[in-house]
Regions:
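Cytoplasmic juxtamembrane regions at transmembrane-helix boundaries
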Residues: 97-111
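Generic short alpha-helical segment signal, independent of protein family or function
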Residues: 85-92, 96, 116
Length: 245
């Protein structure tokens, strides 16, 4: 997660060489709606209930049941599936889906969301220091894998939900699967998954709420002298860069 976190910082620093899609307006719109925080905060709150009875005891019961049922079997697909919704933020538009924002705006949105996610997840993990159910480390709460994939799923919903609800369904199905596999693999308590999902959704919405401000900031840095555009042919997909002198 830390490597991807620093990659996002690099993207933010290199956007000035990419960017006209953010130069459309000097006006700052307001994307924030108070009701948008209800669901993610509810999920985070549900996750914290794992520290008190009766859910605290229920966590051990679920872990013990799964350990007996699963035996030594483990899967690793969750390590890769967590990134599918994130890749879809760009991949769906290359396949013809209509996104709400252009590539630059989506990158700003994603970068802001991931920075928020990294800050929230790591600050909680290393403050709470909850032991994992398998005893391997003291950073179980909240689930970082789940937060990452739910952030991606929510960004897919924001960007492509108006084009087709099935994009949202697919992304959230992948996210739920990742969360379930984290519990199956004995890497997280089930309440960690609730909290991780809430953090991921909240982070995605922070990226969306902040987009008018990050767009304006990048506009001031870059001016309006360049733009990027996607293209696709029989050889594959690519991004083009056009410069105006």
């Amino acid at each position: 997660m830390l490597r991807l976190f620093f990659t996002i910082l690099v993207i933010l620093l290199t956007l000035p060489s990419m960017g006209r899609g953010i130069c459309d307006s000097d006006a700052v719109e307001n994307n924030f709606k108070a009701g948008d925080v209800v669901m993610p905060l509810t999920l985070i709150g549900a996750g914290t209930l794992g520290f008190v009875e009766p859910l605290k005891n229920a966590r051990y019961e679920v872990r013990d049941y799964l350990n007996e049922w699963r035996g030594d079997h483990r899967v690793t697909v969750d390590d890769y599936l967590q990134y599918v919704p994130l890749a879809s933020i760009y991949g769906l538009s290359l396949l013809g889906a209509e996104a709400k924002h252009g590539y630059i705006d989506r990158t700003l949105e994603f970068a802001t969301a991931y920075i928020a996610l990294g800050a929230i997840v790591n600050s909680i993990k290393y403050t709470v220091r909850e032991p994992r159910p398998d005893g391997s480390a003291n950073n179980s709460f909240p689930s970082g894998h789940t937060a990452t994939t739910f952030m991606g799923a929510e960004l897919v919903r924001i960007e492509y939900g108006e084009d087709s609800p099935w994009y949202s369904v697919g992304a959230y199905t992948a996210a739920i699967t990742v969360g379930a596999l984290r519990v199956y693999n004995n890497r997280h308590w089930f309440t960690d998954i609730f909290a991780g999902a809430g953090v991921g959704i909240l982070s995605a919405r922070i990226g969306y709420w902040m987009l008018p401000y990050t767009r304006r900031l990048m506009h001031k840095i870059t001016g309006c002298d360049a733009f990027i555009y996607p293209s696709m042919d029989s050889q594959g997909a690519s991004l083009g860069l056009s410069l105006r002198f």
